[in-house]
Structure formats: structure tokens, C-alpha cells
From Swiss-Prot:
Alphabetical list of NCBIfam families matching this protein: PRK00136.1 (NF001109)
Similarity section: Belongs to the universal ribosomal protein uS8 family.
Coiled coil: none
Record keywords: Ribonucleoprotein, Ribosomal protein, RNA-binding, rRNA-binding
Organism for this UniProt entry: Bradyrhizobium sp. (strain ORS 278)
GO molecular function (one): structural constituent of ribosome
UniProt protein name: Small ribosomal subunit protein uS8
Role description: One of the primary rRNA binding proteins, it binds directly to 16S rRNA central domain where it helps coordinate assembly of the platform of the 30S subunit.
């Protein structure tokens, strides 16, 4: 299946799986999705992920979702920059999500990273999505 916006597809799969209290969800594999998942894992929003290779040559990523007291750890996940309307920001104007309780995930020249990492590295970039 071809998707025009792989990040929105990933976010939607995570959101839908958590609404149904699934423990795992799979998504087509790509380097960008893996680096986004690495940020979510390091920030504690998912348990982990694993890349699986199929005999046909395509890869798939299995994501282990995280729950606390039966409730999803990710309360809100929202796409900011979309293919029709890209949102870029400088390091000075990086958005704070819920007064610092959530994170923004950015695509920067130094790779995909959370907003606090971008502030530390003094780089801006495209705001992909926010998580709370």
C-alpha cells in the first residue's frame, strides 16, 4: 500500500491501536519512521520497536505500545507539518507542548529529534508532530 504521508500514517496507526488497547502495531518500514520511533522510545512514549524483513524484500516495523494503569501513555499525538502546509521554526521559536509536559518532534539538519534536544543542539527545523 502506498502512502503519500508516511509520518501521518505512522501517527494514525499508533493512535488507532491505542484506542483499541492493542499491545503492538505494525507499520511499513523506513529509515524515517525508525528514527521517529527512536525519539518516541527515548522519550518514554513507546516500549520499543523491532524491524522485521520479509522474504519478499520489504521491511516492517513492529511497535510495542506503552500503557500506565491501563491508560495509553500517549494522551494526544497531533501532526503539525503536513505535505500541503509545511511548518518550519527557528530554535528561538520552538513550540512548548503543554508547558513542557509534552514534546515536539522535529526534522533538523542534524536528524530527527525532540524539541529539547534541538534547543541543546541550537538547531531549528520542520515541526513534524507534537506528543502529550
Amino acid at each position: 500500500m502506498s502512502t503519500h504521508d508516511p509520518i501521518s500514517d505512522l501517527i494514525t496507526r499508533i493512535r488507532n491501536a491505542q484506542m483499541r488497547s492493542k499491545s503492538k502495531v505494525t507499520t511499513p518500514g523506513s529509515k524515517m519512521r525508525a528514527s521517529v520511533l527512536e525519539v518516541l522510545k527515548s522519550e518514554g512514549y513507546i516500549r520499543g520497536y523491532a524491524t522485521m524483513e520479509h522474504p519478499s524484500g520489504r521491511s516492517e516495523i513492529e511497535i510495542e505500545l506503552k500503557y500506565f494503569d491501563g491508560e495509553p501513555v500517549i494522551r494526544e499525538i497531533e501532526r503539525v507539518s503536513k505535505p500541503g502546509r509545511r511548518v518550519y521554526t527557528s530554535v528561538k521559536n520552538l513550540p512548548r507542548v503543554n508547558n513542557g509536559l509534552g514534546i515536539s518532534v522535529l526534522s533538523t539538519p542534524k536528524g530527527i529529534m525532540a524539541d529539547h534536544s534541538a534547543r541543546d543542539a541550537n538547531v531549528g527545523g520542520e515541526v513534524l508532530f507534537t506528543v502529550f
